[in-house]
Amino acid sequence: MSLDVAAVRGWFDEYFATFEACARGDGDMSELLRHYGVPLIFTSDAGITTLMTDDEAAAMMQGLIDGLRANGYHHTDVLNPEVSVLNAASALYRGTLSRLNADGVEFDRPTVTFLATDDVAGLRIALIAVQGK
């Protein structure tokens, strides 16, 4: 994939659609997991976690999805998305993720920055950084 703003936006649109389907129980977790590279770095105010295997990434994503389901998650509206192509092999995607339940009520609103890298496996997320509050 040639990294340009439109290609990265399109890839993330597909990623969020896959994430939403999995979080609602309508999607296949293996489809979601193909969006993540390993190692995968996750950082937030709670600290830094480096996931070194596919199984570790799967467990973390399952934990996140379980938490969203407990809140009646239905979908995410990405507010103010920004894409910055860093070079031929990587790009940043940043947006505020308005997470809504089936009634359209927002229950979470983190701002998240993703680093996506393009290698022989295609574009994959290498870092997820949740902005502090």
Locate each region found by the language model:
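Hydrophobic alpha-helical core bundles mediating ligand binding, dimerization, or RNAP-core interactions
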Residues: 12-19, 36, 57-64, 97, ...
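A solvent-exposed, acidic/Ser-Thr-rich amphipathic alpha-helical stretch
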Residues: 29-81
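Short, cysteine-centered beta-strand-loop-beta hairpins and adjacent loop/turn segments enriched
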Residues: 99-107
